[in-house]
Amino acid sequence: MLMGQYEHTIDAKGRVIIPAKFRGELGDRFVLTKGLDNCLFVYSLEEWKNIEAKLKTLPLTKKDARAFTRFFLAGAVECEIDKQGRILIPANLREHAKIEKDVIFIGVSTRVEIWSKEVWEEYSNNTDVSFEEIAEHLDELNI
């Protein structure tokens, strides 16, 4: 399970070190794509196959399903970790996540999220609902 929070700095070429704690579970190659809430999602190749299978079941007749699939897949790239443990985050994905310098990596069960430090701090400090309020509603999700 992917969990924890780590901070790194992106270099001038758009490369960033993937935290060692995540490398073992993600493998040397994985998929990076546009995420929700102005972050990036990182999936192992195995988990990406599961995501693709779910996306294939979405009805083409539904406008929202088509739009989400386009958004999600158009931004997806396969990444390979270099010898220094880094990946290159393409410019379009850095722009989507507003990443300029400092980044936060967050393990979220089956994926890693990559956030601009500033965006993460704003998101986590200004969430409309408290952690306790979210926890109260988890029973509705059978958790």
Swiss-Prot record:
Keywords: Cytoplasm, DNA-binding, Repeat, Transcription, Transcription regulation. SUPFAM superfamilies: AbrB/MazE/MraZ-like. GO terms for molecular function: DNA-binding transcription factor activity; transcription cis-regulatory region binding. It is found in: Cytoplasm, Nucleoid. GO terms for biological process: negative regulation of DNA-templated transcription initiation. The keyword tRNA-binding does not apply. Residues 5-47, 76-119 form the SpoVT-AbrB domain. This is Transcriptional regulator MraZ. CDD domains: MraZ_C, MraZ_N. Belongs to the MraZ family. It comes from the Bacteria. NCBIfam families: division/cell wall cluster transcriptional repressor MraZ (TIGR00242). It comes from Thermoanaerobacter pseudethanolicus (strain ATCC 33223 / 39E) (Clostridium thermohydrosulfuricum). GO terms for cellular component: cytoplasm; nucleoid. InterPro entries: MraZ, MraZ_C, MraZ_dom, MraZ_N, MraZ_sf, SpoVT-AbrB_dom, SpoVT-AbrB_sf. Forms oligomers.
